Amino acid sequence: MNEAIIQLDHIDITFRQKKRVIEAVKDVTVHINQGDIYGIVGYSGAGKSTLVRVINLLQAPTNGKITVDGDVTFEQGKVQLSANALRQKRRDIGMIFQHFNLMAQKTAKENVAFALRHSSLSKTEKEHKVIELLELVGLSERADNYPAQLSGGQKQRVAIARALANDPKILISDEATSALDPKTTKQILALLQELNRKLGLTIVMITHEMQIVKDICNRVAVMQNGVLIEEGSVLDIFSNPKEALTQEFITTATGIDEALEKINQQDIVKHLPANALLAQLKYAGTSTDEPLLNSIYRQFEVTANILYGNIEILDHIPVGDMIVVLEGQAENILAAEKALHEAGVDVSILKRGA
């Protein structure tokens, strides 16, 4: 089992503006394991970016304890490292942002090399390092291009290479794909996954998009108004969201709400027979491999008319979502519901026939 590389314990962050006190983060505890791709999701103003800046103490918390890679960096209201040790610790943490923050007058390779200006490497070693980093992010052929000559995705690749220049153990991505088109976003997420696998890099993803969490993360924390309201594996959160905000994020990411709107306009649903009901079936893991609807027809003579179906792969595990009309004798439908529950399927009745 991997150990926690980032431990944020009971973090409070308070700002004072004139006569107002703003509680940006309230008693948040997050532990992130080595090798995780960990998502922190929430709407603008939720406190997620403020929280993540305490990892490298770009933002000092008001209260709480921070441990990074085994070292306590902040406790009892004070930074626990010397200035030199803090600088070294920050080198272990790379950051990328929505706006790429590249220097317009420097080429791609010069932007990456800038991050090595305090490195103990020789000039030749630095040059080799820059070439290796640009190859790693798939941009070696653009080494001599200036930012103005690069697309948004290419600029972000340069920013990623620069963030990796000092061989960090942790990479923080603060809305790094927000300015990119969907195709480029997928390419950047695929690159981050590859870096996670190749380098054993721990990645913290700050985002307002649950789709990104679904595509890349293995664990997720949901924040609202400075409070962590839900946390767990992506599989658990998507399979069984407990909080209303989490459910809202997930329905947006899966498109189930939009599907239901269209389904409710269909004649079969508008005029549901007395011996039928509209149900949503959610299932995960081995349940997705079983011919469950065929099984309930054979056992209970309950037919299933599939109006919507979707299977996602979350952290290597298939997760299914289906909207069906179940039709049969009332007692048989009850028996079929029970059989589905016993097979690990969550059954929600959306409408009963009149």
UniProtKB/Swiss-Prot annotation:
Species whose genome carries this gene: Streptococcus pyogenes serotype M3 (strain ATCC BAA-595 / MGAS315)
Respond yes or no to whether keyword Membrane is given for this record: yes
> How does this chain sit within the bilayer?
Peripheral membrane protein
Please name the GO terms that the record assigns under molecular function: ABC-type D-methionine transporter activity; ATP binding; ATP hydrolysis activity
In terms of Pfam families, this protein maps to: ABC_tran, NIL
Q: Tell me where it resides.
A: Cell membrane
Q: Which reaction does it catalyse?
A: L-methionine(out) + ATP + H2O = L-methionine(in) + ADP + phosphate + H(+); D-methionine(out) + ATP + H2O = D-methionine(in) + ADP + phosphate + H(+)
What are the protein's UniProt keywords?
Amino-acid transport, ATP-binding, Cell membrane, Membrane, Nucleotide-binding, Translocase, Transport
- What this protein is called in its record is Methionine import ATP-binding protein MetN
Could you name the Gene Ontology cellular component terms for this entry?
plasma membrane
Please name the InterPro entries in this protein's record.
AAA+_ATPase, ABC_transporter-like_ATP-bd, ABC_transporter-like_CS, ACT-like_dom_sf, MetN_ABC, MetN_ABC_transporter-like, NIL_domain, P-loop_NTPase
Subunit: The complex is composed of two ATP-binding proteins (MetN), two transmembrane proteins (MetI) and a solute-binding protein (MetQ).
Q: State which Enzyme Commission number(s) the record gives.
A: 7.4.2.11
Does the keyword field hold Transport?
yes
What is the role of the protein in this entry? Part of the ABC transporter complex MetNIQ involved in methionine import. Responsible for energy coupling to the transport system.
Family membership, please give it: Belongs to the ABC transporter superfamily. Methionine importer (TC 3.A.1.24) family.
List, for all copies, the residue spans of the domain called ABC transporter: 8-250
Chief localization class? Answer: membrane
